[in-house]
From Swiss-Prot:
One of its GO terms (cellular component) is cytosolic large ribosomal subunit. InterPro entries: Ribosomal_protein_uL29, Ribosomal_uL29, Ribosomal_uL29_CS, Ribosomal_uL29_sf. This is Large ribosomal subunit protein uL29. GO terms for molecular function: structural constituent of ribosome. Keywords: Ribonucleoprotein, Ribosomal protein.
Length: 77
């Protein structure tokens, strides 16, 4: 899997696409944990890529939620 998880690429995706991608990455992360625990891990660098991609997606989701909250509170004032 030669996926790129650059912030600019992730910002272009919809919220539903990000949630689906996050779910897939979480599943992959679990599979990597099990394979590492059993000693069958082949691609150890992928663990780092997946972990960082999950963090990027969560960060973007949090930022968009904060922006939406700031807009509604500014509109109320």
């Amino acid at each position: 899997m030669a996926d790129t998880y650059k912030p600019a690429d992730l910002r272009a995706k919809s919220e539903d696409e990000l949630n689906a991608l996050l779910l897939d990455l979480k599943r992959e992360q679990i599979n990597h944990r099990f394979s590492a625990a059993t000693g069958q891990s082949e691609n150890t660098s992928r663990v780092k890529v997946v972990r960082r991609a999950v963090a990027r997606i969560k960060t973007l989701a949090h930022q968009s939620k904060n922006r939406a909250g700031a807009k509604t509170s500014a509109a109320k004032s």
